[in-house]
Curated annotation (Swiss-Prot):
Residue ranges crossing the lipid bilayer per the database entry: 5-25, 51-71, 79-99, 116-136, 149-169, 172-192, 197-217, 224-244, 252-272, 299-319
Biological role: Catalyzes the initial step of the lipid cycle reactions in the biosynthesis of the cell wall peptidoglycan: transfers peptidoglycan precursor phospho-MurNAc-pentapeptide from UDP-MurNAc-pentapeptide onto the lipid carrier undecaprenyl phosphate, yielding undecaprenyl-pyrophosphoryl-MurNAc-pentapeptide, known as lipid I.
Cofactor(s) needed: Mg(2+)
Keywords: Cell cycle, Cell division, Cell membrane, Cell shape, Cell wall biogenesis/degradation, Magnesium, Membrane, Metal-binding, Peptidoglycan synthesis, Transferase, Transmembrane, Transmembrane helix
Membrane disposition: Multi-pass membrane protein
Catalytic activity entry: UDP-N-acetyl-alpha-D-muramoyl-L-alanyl-gamma-D-glutamyl-L-lysyl-D-alanyl-D-alanine + di-trans,octa-cis-undecaprenyl phosphate = Mur2Ac(oyl-L-Ala-gamma-D-Glu-L-Lys-D-Ala-D-Ala)-di-trans,octa-cis-undecaprenyl diphosphate + UMP
Protein name: Phospho-N-acetylmuramoyl-pentapeptide-transferase
Keyword Nucleus (UniProt): no
EC number: 2.7.8.13
Organism of origin: Lactobacillus gasseri (strain ATCC 33323 / DSM 20243 / BCRC 14619 / CIP 102991 / JCM 1131 / KCTC 3163 / NCIMB 11718 / NCTC 13722 / AM63)
Signal peptide: none
Family annotation (CDD domains): GT_MraY (cd06852)
Location(s), subcellular: Cell membrane
Length: 319
């Protein structure tokens, strides 16, 4: 099978065609983002900006992946696992966004409801992988390759839930999570291409195409936000791709900004609960730099560069 940019082009085209219509629909319905009180005060001017844009690039990515792989006669169980992970986490985010919009508040699903949904999707992925005779083995530093279905399943559960939330935490500035996700998915597209894993190539290129189309409307000043529907889907998709390329640990470098954003929140909570003091002015850490006086564009560019450096380092050493 030959490499093709058709998945990228298809997803990009679908997104740039339908996203303006979606933005117009949301504005007509007066449905927009409710900005949380705990965030930077200058973010309040973003209140009312249409959200849930992730639904558009998510569907564009799924449609493009499916029709291209059907056309190439390469549809297999891995395809469906990727789609289920991407759509499954996206649906959880969609429900979360929908509740926020319906009740005009910044809180959607309760934490336990969202976590339960994420665990169910992860469990489904594990079950499908098991039925597909996927190699349940995990490399553990200093211990080597460990073949243990239970340990591997726990890891997959943690990885999917953890990174879906990590991307979600990073979606706090115009274009930030979109740019970081483009870099991460492009890195995995290259790895999959090198390994001739055409299913993952098609999926990652479709997601990249959707994200590039979405970025046109999401960069500062954003005309639309991706919402939890987009960020949870992107995180779940990244985690699943890393696992099915048998390179799960790669996400620690390729998704280094997502990791740092999450660590900043964890450290802040631990510090405040144990000492009563905060390490950062505000978390996730992109808000800390805003509080230091950095513009959104400066934070975006610096964080994108860090993400790009992480990906390049991984490719140089292990690619």
């Amino acid at each position: 099978m030959q490499f093709s940019l058709i998945p990228f082009i298809s997803s990009f085209a679908l997104t740039v065609i339908f996203l303006p219509l979606f933005i117009g629909f949301m504005r007509m319905k007066h449905e927009g983002q409710v900005i949380r009180d705990e965030g930077p005060k200058w973010h309040e001017k973003k209140s009312g900006t249409p959200t849930m844009g992730g639904v558009v690039f998510m569907l564009a990515s799924v449609i493009s992946t499916l029709w291209v792989l059907i056309w190439q006669k390469n549809l297999n169980k891995t395809t469906w696992i990727l789609i289920i992970a991407f759509l499954g986490y996206g649906i959880i985010g969609f429900l979360d966004d929908g509740i926020k919009l319906y009740f005009k508040r910044n809180l959607g699903l309760k934490a336990w409801q969202k976590l339960l949904g994420q665990i169910i999707i992860a469990a489904l992925i594990i079950a499908l992988a098991f039925s597909d005779h996927f190699a349940f083995e995990l490399y553990i530093p200093f211990a080597g390759m460990v073949r243990n279905s239970f340990l591997f399943s726990l890891f997959v559960l943690f990885w999917l839930v953890g990174f879906s939330n990590a991307v979600n935490l990073s979606d706090g500035l115009d274009g930030l999570a979109t740019g970081l996700s483009i870099i991460a998915y492009a890195t995995y597209a290259w790895i999959a291409y090198q390994e001739k894993n055409w299913v993952i190539v098609a999926f990652t290129l479709s997601v990249i195409g959707g994200l590039v189309g979405f970025f046109i409307f999401n960069h500062k000043p954003a005309k639309i936000f991706m919402g939890d529907a987009g960020s949870l889907a992107l995180g779940g998709g990244l985690a699943t791709v890393s696992i099915f390329l048998h390179r799960p640990w790669s996400l620690l470098l390729i998704g280094i900004v997502f990791v740092l954003e999450t660590l900043s929140v964890i450290l802040q909570v631990i510090s405040f609960q144990t000492t009563g003091k905060r390490i950062f002015k505000m978390t996730p850490i992109h808000h800390h730099f805003e509080m230091l006086g950095w513009s959104e564009w400066k934070v975006d560019i610096v964080f994108w560069i860090v993400g790009l450096i992480g990906s390049i380092i991984y490719l140089i050493i292990w690619g």
